[in-house]
């Protein structure tokens, strides 16, 4: 039983690492240019430092935020 749990944990970690590697999250070269975004499914709003960080967040959290205007929410 312990080996099954360990196996499942390792599979989860591997999937998480694979997902992270597909996402483009090197946003250091992008200037601070805040955007207000809305999540299409939930309607939640969030301020992101720039569009790169918004895209990174969407990819790593499986969300669908879209920019609704420039500036903080």
From Swiss-Prot:
Organs and tissues of expression: Expressed by the venom gland (anterior main gland) (at protein level).
InterPro entries named among the record's database cross-references: Kazal_dom (IPR002350), Kazal_dom_sf (IPR036058)
Superkingdom classification of source: Eukaryota
GO MF annotation: an example: serine-type endopeptidase inhibitor activity
Record-level GO cellular component terms: extracellular region
Domain Kazal-like, first and last residues per copy: 21-73
Gene3D superfamilies referenced in this protein's UniProt entry, alphabetically: 3.30.60.30
Pfam families: Kazal_2
Annotated positions for site Reactive bond: 29-30
Membrane spanning residue stretches: none
Cysteines paired by S-S bonds: 23-59, 27-52, 36-73
Keywords: Disulfide bond, Protease inhibitor, Secreted, Serine protease inhibitor, Signal
Stated role: May act as a serine protease inhibitor, since it possess the kazal serine protease inhibitor signature.
Protein name: Kazal peptide Pr13a
Organism for this UniProt entry: Platymeris rhadamanthus (Red spot assassin bug)
Taxonomic classification: Eukaryota, Metazoa, Ecdysozoa, Arthropoda, Hexapoda
């Amino acid at each position: 039983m312990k080996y099954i749990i360990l196996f499942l944990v390792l599979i989860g970690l591997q999937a998480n690492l694979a997902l992270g590697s597909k996402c483009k999250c090197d946003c250091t070269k992008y200037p601070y240019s805040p955007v207000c975004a809305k999540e299409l499914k939930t309607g939640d709003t969030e301020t992101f430092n720039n569009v790169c960080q918004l895209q990174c967040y969407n990819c790593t959290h499986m969300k669908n935020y879209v920019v609704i205007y420039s500036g903080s929410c």
